[in-house]
Each structure stands twice: as C-alpha cells, then as structure tokens.
C-alpha cells in the first residue's frame, strides 16, 4: 500500500504494484490491473476496466457519463487495454446502448493532453492522438493511426490502419488505410509513405499499395467498381484491406475526383 496515497479515494478493485497519487478518485465499479501509474487528481468512474502497465496522468477523467442526450443512466462500459499513456486532462466516456454499450481502447496507445474520446469509440492498438484531438461518438480507429493536434473527427467516421491525419484538420468522411488526409474538410493527400517504410519490411507491399492507390484515387474511374476489380485480382493482404475498406465505407472517401 506504500505506493497509494492516503489522500486517494479508492472504492474499486486495484491490482498489484500500482502507484496512485493524492486526490485520485476510483469509484466502486472500476477494475484496474497491475503495474499502473495513476497521477494526482485523476477521476476513474463508471463501469471502467483498465488493464496492466498504463500511465494515466493528472486530471484525466475516465468513465464519466456519455455526452449524449439519449443516455439515461444505462449500464455501459469503458474498457482500456495495456501499456497506454493517457495524458493530462483527457476525457474518455463509456458507451451507450445505441452503440454497443462500450467504448474500447486497445494497447500501446498515446493520448496526449486534452484529448476527448466520446461514447462508443473504438481505438485499436499503437495509435497516437496529439493534443486536443477529438473523437466524436462511434468513431473507429484501426491500428497505427496518427491524428494531429486540434483535429475533430465526426461521428461514425472510420480511419484505417497506418493512416495519418494532419493537425488542425476536420475529418467528416472515412479515411482509408495507409493514407494521409489533411484540411478542413480533410481530403486525401497521398500515401503515408514515411509510416509504411518504418513498419513494412517488404518493399513489394509498399509498391503494391502505391499501385492500388493510383488506380483507386487517381485514375478517374468509379471508385467502388475499381475497388472490386482490384480485390478480385490481388493476392496482397494490404491491398485487399484497402479495397475492402473502400467498399465497406459508409460515410464516403474524401478525395479529388479526376475527370
């Protein structure tokens, strides 16, 4: 107990080797795993489950009621995985009945200061949200997404793996995997080649993604027809994922269509 401040208010379940600062409030329905650091004046409430080896910085608020007028006190959850860094003044809400009743954050993510994660959001693994990035309800991020600071993302938008969003953008449509988007409203600006070169060992995969991107977004052909054609002819798993993302998009893809 030597790592838990006497000035913390703890009603929930705490794992082994956790360090909890003064003024922290952990309510009765919270479950926290092992080796977590929770800095002073953080509030963790609601039906919140947190894994192992996370660092939650001062004044973060996790699990407070969804900011949704349709929410009327139903039992909904916030689930956070392992090895995440959640910086100062971040706000993360649980889910709502209309969205599966759960907000989920995976492993190895960095949420910088003043980030907001709204109800029913899904964040996968290894994502970075820079300062004051804002995810509205039901947004979904696949692995290795990077979102620049001061960027809001509209409700129900999906952002694909390895995509990067420029700072001070406004994202209103789905952003495919492996791409860069920027602007208000954000549009595709090309491929996230720097990120791909860092993470992909096989150069032929990057070349295949480049070719597919040009066919999809620079050929002037109908987008979904082109995605179907490529999907039927490719064996590359990343190209398949790109095409399937395009075909399954519900909010559309923001790009400048060639004539």
Curated annotation (Swiss-Prot):
The entry lists its GO molecular-function terms as: acyl-[acyl-carrier-protein]-UDP-N-acetylglucosamine O-acyltransferase activity
The protein's UniProt keywords, in alphabetical order, are: Acyltransferase, Cytoplasm, Lipid A biosynthesis, Lipid biosynthesis, Lipid metabolism, Repeat, Transferase
Enzyme class, spelled out: transferase
The protein's annotated pathway: Glycolipid biosynthesis; lipid IV(A) biosynthesis; lipid IV(A) from (3R)-3-hydroxytetradecanoyl-[acyl-carrier-protein] and UDP-N-acetyl-alpha-D-glucosamine: step 1/6
**Do you know which InterPro entries this protein is assigned to?**
Acetyltransf_C (IPR029098), Acetyltransf_C_sf (IPR037157), Hexapep (IPR001451), Hexapep_transf_CS (IPR018357), Lipid_A_LpxA (IPR010137), Trimer_LpxA-like_sf (IPR011004)
UniProt xrefs under Pfam families:
Acetyltransf_11 (PF13720), Hexapep (PF00132)
- Provide the leader sequence positions: none
Can you state which reaction this protein catalyses?
Answer: a (3R)-hydroxyacyl-[ACP] + UDP-N-acetyl-alpha-D-glucosamine = a UDP-3-O-[(3R)-3-hydroxyacyl]-N-acetyl-alpha-D-glucosamine + holo-[ACP]
Q: Which PROSITE patterns match?
A: HEXAPEP_TRANSFERASES
Assembly mode: Homotrimer.
Q: What does this protein do?
A: Involved in the biosynthesis of lipid A, a phosphorylated glycolipid that anchors the lipopolysaccharide to the outer membrane of the cell.
Task: Kindly provide the name given to this protein in its UniProt entry.
Answer: Acyl-[acyl-carrier-protein]--UDP-N-acetylglucosamine O-acyltransferase
């Amino acid at each position: 107990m030597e790592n838990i401040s006497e000035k913390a208010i703890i009603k929930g379940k705490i794992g082994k080797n956790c360090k909890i600062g003064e003024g922290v409030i952990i309510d009765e329905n919270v479950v926290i795993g092992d080796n977590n650091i929770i800095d002073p004046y953080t509030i963790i409430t609601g039906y919140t489950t947190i894994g192992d080896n996370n660092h939650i910085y001062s004044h973060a608020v996790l699990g407070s009621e969804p900011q949704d007028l349709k929410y009327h006190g139903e039992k909904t959850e916030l689930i956070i995985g392992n090895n995440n860094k959640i910086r100062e003044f971040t706000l993360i809400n649980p889910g709502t009945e209309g969205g599966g009743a759960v907000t989920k954050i995976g492993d190895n993510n960095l949420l910088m200061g003043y980030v907001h994660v709204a109800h029913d959001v899904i964040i996968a693994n290894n994502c970075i949200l820079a300062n004051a990035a804002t995810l509205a309800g039901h947004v979904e991020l696949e692995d290795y997404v990077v979102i620049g600071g001061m960027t809001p993302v509209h409700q129900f938008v999906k952002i694909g793996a390895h995509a990067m969003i420029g700072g001070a953008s406004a994202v209103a449509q789905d952003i495919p995997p492996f791409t860069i988007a920027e602007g208000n409203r954000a549009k595709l600006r090309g491929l996230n080649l720097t990120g791909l070169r860092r993470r992909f060992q096989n150069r032929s995969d990057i070349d295949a993604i480049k070719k597919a991107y040009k066919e999809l977004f620079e050929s002037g052909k109908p987008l979904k027809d082109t995605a179907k054609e490529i999907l039927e002819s490719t064996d590359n798993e990343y190209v398949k994922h790109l095409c399937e993302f395009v075909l399954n998009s519900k909010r559309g893809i923001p790009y400048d269509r060639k004539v």
